[in-house]
């Protein structure tokens, strides 16, 4: 599925003769692999990975990755949950491929939770300042 690619081989001085002659392979993540990495909670370098992807993105993907980078700054749990849903949608065959990572493809991966979050965001933005503060206090208490 193209998540990793062989990057090269390191020669061995000891071990099986075949490995001494051919070397031990080492690998790197492809763009698909990096997107999958963004969906895994236990990876601590997700922000750095996203920054690297944004810098390398082509014109088709640049907008979606830049928006995601902004969301990671203000709402990291939400933003990384978008990557989780995106990879899950690919695993469930709702997407043909992980790349290109475009707004259109991300919208295909949206589920009920995305609609709930959008409804909350739109409603919250319409509240007065005092109502927003009360709502934030309430949500902090139930979190």
Predicted regions and their residues:
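Exposed, interaction-prone assembly regions rather than primary DNA-binding/catalytic cores
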Residues: 43-143
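A short, conserved structural fragment
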Residues: 1-14
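Short, amphipathic alpha-helical interaction segments positioned at domain boundaries
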Residues: 18-54
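Charge-rich, acidic-biased intrinsically disordered regions
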Residues: 14-18, 60
């Amino acid at each position: 599925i193209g998540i990793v690619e062989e990057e090269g081989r390191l020669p061995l001085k000891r071990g099986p003769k075949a490995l001494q002659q051919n070397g031990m392979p080492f690998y790197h993540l492809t763009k698909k692999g990096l997107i999958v990495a963004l969906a895994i909670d236990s990876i601590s370098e997700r922000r750095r990975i996203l920054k690297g992807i944004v810098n390398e993105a082509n014109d088709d993907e640049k907008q979606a990755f830049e928006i995601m980078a902004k969301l990671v700054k203000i709402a990291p749990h939400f933003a990384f949950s978008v990557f989780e849903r995106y990879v899950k949608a690919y695993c469930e065959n709702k997407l043909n491929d992980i790349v290109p990572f475009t707004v259109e493809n991300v919208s295909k991966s949206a589920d009920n939770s995305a609609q709930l979050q959008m409804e909350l965001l739109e409603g919250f933005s319409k509240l007065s300042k005092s109502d927003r503060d009360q709502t934030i206090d309430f949500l902090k208490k139930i979190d």
